């Protein structure tokens, strides 16, 4: 169905708004994908914070002008599905990679993040990026590791000097006085 000018402007405005907020973009070839596969992918996209849309390349190209994804404009050729990660940079990569496992017709064509375009093979790299929660857990571990190592060193010194378990030794006199 052909879009009139006002509908095209709405599509461009919607995509431009999404592109301005997005962390990453993956454009994938989807020709031959069944309706059921697309429906499942759209459902998963909503759950993971990915904006997924099939739109004419000229409209997508206009929408990304002035954003960090403008570098991908010359590669927007052929029937493409656009996946913008809105919450986590790797979400679109994980979505496309997971959907491609059950659908050999779905192939990443463009991977863009941080104002740079990468080969389609980098979808695996993007998919392997940790989620926000995983990154925070890694950071917490890095921050607590020196304190943990210091506590272990103190305990080892106490045990080497014959003190045994310092906490248990301190608890014994308290138990005797009670």
From Swiss-Prot:
Q: Which GO terms describe its biological process?
A: translation
Query: Keyword annotations for this protein?
Result: Ribonucleoprotein, Ribosomal protein, RNA-binding, rRNA-binding
| Any matching Pfam family | Ribosomal_L10
Source organism's superkingdom? Answer: Bacteria
Q: Name one GO molecular function term.
A: large ribosomal subunit rRNA binding
Among InterPro entries, the record links this protein to: Ribosomal_uL10 (IPR001790), Ribosomal_uL10-like_sf (IPR043141), Ribosomal_uL10_bac (IPR022973), Ribosomal_uL10_bac_type (IPR047865)
Cross-referenced CDD domains: Ribosomal_L10
Please provide one cellular component term from the Gene Ontology annotations of this protein. ribosome
How does it associate, per the subunit comment? Part of the ribosomal stalk of the 50S ribosomal subunit. The N-terminus interacts with L11 and the large rRNA to form the base of the stalk. The C-terminus forms an elongated spine to which L12 dimers bind in a sequential fashion forming a multimeric L10(L12)X complex.
The family annotation for this protein states: Belongs to the universal ribosomal protein uL10 family.
Q: What does this protein do?
A: Forms part of the ribosomal stalk, playing a central role in the interaction of the ribosome with GTP-bound translation factors.
Q: What is this protein called?
A: Large ribosomal subunit protein uL10
Organism per entry:
Stenotrophomonas maltophilia (strain K279a)
